[in-house]
Regions:
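Short beta-strand segments
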Residues: 1, 26, 116, 130-131
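Glycine/proline-rich, positively charged
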Residues: 1-35, 39, 50
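Glycine-rich beta-alpha junction loops
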Residues: 3, 29-33, 55-62, 119, ...
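Short helix-capping segments at alpha-helix termini
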Residues: 14-21, 107-109, 149-150
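Conserved, mostly hydrophobic/aromatic
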Residues: 25, 44, 51-54, 101, ...
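Aromatic-lined glycan-binding groove of carbohydrate-active enzymes
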Residues: 36-76, 111
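Terminal-tail/helix-coil boundary detector
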Residues: 46, 74-103, 107, 122-127, ...
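Short catalytic/ligand-gating loop segments at beta-alpha or beta-beta junctions
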Residues: 109-117
């Protein structure tokens, strides 16, 4: 989780010291958080770093399991009051967006989670995703994304919901 200027400085210092530079960057990147597209992903491409984003499902929000009109279930991160999700992804705008993605994905015959993973993997700069399944079913959902092709209509949907380089909520900044 480094800003692009820090990545450049790390690469410069590694070259100066004659040691291997980093080989991968793990940004927080998904369809609700497109901020890395502005500087981080281009820096990775420039310096030849692999990109393995974490939280492609936005801590589960992009699965569409949270209805913005319904209190989250007790067995969910939001239902347990998990601080990370409550301070980040669990915002009305994101929940509404996730429901729109869910409807679109289901029309294509896939789950919203598969769609969200596929969206991240569709970025040519991305090497892989850092998956965090809690169950075998979750793991299979990540793998299922490899069975689909991303369409121009899919990309247009995400571009309509979240502008390139921005988060799902205008002016939002992840409190890392």
């Amino acid at each position: 989780n480094y800003r692009s200027w820090r990545m450049a400085e790390i690469v410069r210092l590694c070259e100066q010291m004659g040691v291997p530079k980093p080989i991968v960057c793990q940004p927080y990147y998904n369809a609700m958080n497109r901020m890395p597209e502005v500087e981080v992903l281009p820096a990775c491409q420039h310096y030849g770093l692999g990109v393995v984003p974490y939280s492609p499902l936005a801590r589960g929000v992009l699965t569409g399991k949270y209805d913005p009109k319904v209190k989250p279930g007790k067995g969910t991160r939001a239902g347990r009051g998990d601080q990370r999700i409550m301070e980040t992804e669990f915002r009305k705008e994101s929940l509404i967006m996730a429901q729109k993605i869910k409807v679109h994905a289901e029309k294509r015959g896939m789950s919203a989670g598969v769609f969200a993973t596929l969206w991240v993997l569709n970025n040519k700069i991305v090497t892989s995703v850092l998956a965090g399944p809690r169950t075998v079913a979750h793991w299979n959902g990540y793998l299922e994304a490899l069975d689909y092709e991303f369409s121009p209509e899919d990309e247009a949907l995400i571009d309509k919901l979240v502008a390139m380089g921005h988060p799902s909520t205008p002016g939002y900044s992840d409190p890392q």
